[in-house]
């Protein structure tokens, strides 16, 4: 619906008319009744990570690992609160840490993915939550193994530019090389794993790099059809990170990127984190956002701990003020709930939950 050159010109433009024209185009083209969200629990199995991103506060040097009883307690509490997504995450390649490796061995596991698989299988067997894993770079065989117990999986592309590997954002983060991330997203497509990816805006990228990243996601999705949602996430400066003095992207910049994401990505859902956009989130709905992402009544956002989740009643108020309806979803979007896209275990669990009848 828009060319690369047109998209770059739009981001570079200071014309308010350009913005209003494209907002009108989006609202005339994409007819929406519902804005969705996922009610989840956030389970950070470990915060140690081989990457040291300039904007990250999630990473810890301490090689800690959540114990099974800690995880199961959160899952059971979340189940009682009506959560339906279990977001499992940990730092990339935690197995490189000797102390974590020893902790895993003491529990009878050779690696973190064996431990993760058991926890996710337990989740399916003992709760009404569905696992979604986002743990950094995984290879084809690892993705294939985890597909068996995951409703969907995710990895932020962040940006497709290799140039950022030489900047404060990613110079100490080998796992953030776009070739690795693109390869993983493509492998997920080959395996028919419903997938979440996204861009991180404000980490030193150029407008051209933003546009090229959106077109790269489009290219991959056109080949495999597995990208269910794209997150447009704004960088937030935090005390103590290397990029604490970096300027955050303006609301207008975010608005324009969201507009382009909708025009370029078409039928892929566009998500923004509501806890990072409390004052501007409603405006972004006008630009094509149709999903608020995961929010939790139990656990905090460990990636952005300073930003509390809004309550669901707040999301409903923000949504209904624009004449739209708020609707809860699973971590896998309804259009991917089929035997074509899900493992037998996960598909049968969703049928057992009666979700498709709701």
Swiss-Prot record:
Essential cofactor(s): [4Fe-4S] cluster
Classification via Gene3D superfamilies: Aldolase class I
Catalysis performed (reactions): 5-amino-5-(4-hydroxybenzyl)-6-(D-ribitylimino)-5,6-dihydrouracil + S-adenosyl-L-methionine = 7,8-didemethyl-8-hydroxy-5-deazariboflavin + 5'-deoxyadenosine + L-methionine + NH4(+) + H(+)
Keyword Nucleotidyltransferase attributed: no
Pathway field: Cofactor biosynthesis; coenzyme F0 biosynthesis
SUPFAM superfamilies associated with the record: Radical SAM enzymes
EC number(s) reported in the record: 4.3.1.32
Residues binding [4Fe-4S] cluster, per UniProt: 49, 53, 56
Residues covered by the Radical SAM core domain: 35-275
Family of the protein in this entry: Belongs to the radical SAM superfamily. CofG family.
Assembly and oligomerization: Consists of two subunits, CofG and CofH.
Matching PANTHER family: 7,8-DIDEMETHYL-8-HYDROXY-5-DEAZARIBOFLAVIN SYNTHASE (PTHR43076:SF15), FO SYNTHASE (COFH) (PTHR43076)
Protein name, per record: 7,8-didemethyl-8-hydroxy-5-deazariboflavin synthase
Gene that specifies this protein: cofG
